[in-house]
């Protein structure tokens, strides 16, 4: 429902209109769609989700997100997390009470502090990031990052240096296998995008 609602809005836009503000609007529309469904049918009262949306305009990556789904960029063998999780354990990290490495093992690791479809008033984080040539963009759910840490993600990407479409499919498969081998029970969702500048 969330993806359908956001997608219907974004599909009506021209590529150049996929700005931070419109990505944010798509998530707000998804939020309202879930709230409306809950009002119509009690069986959906517990419905809620995390959400991340991204677009590339020129060499700029625009993004909007709520929850603990993540956006990463890989370039020059460096993996950078662009988004900040809206979660209880991330708040503990920010307060210096636990390390990032401890997040996956904390008993309250699955508690998110912000979600789509819970309250009418929703704060959506947005931002943009300049992509370098040959950057790799990874969007993923906590089904991936809750099971394997950034070092494993970094290692898997480094072991798949080529970036053809078939290579990206293999990288997708390898990352999913790592998560399921680590015991993933949740859905593991991820999207990989290779950015290559078009030279005039």
Task: Describe each region flagged by the PLM.
Residues 1-200:
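PP2C/PPM-type serine/threonine phosphatase catalytic domain
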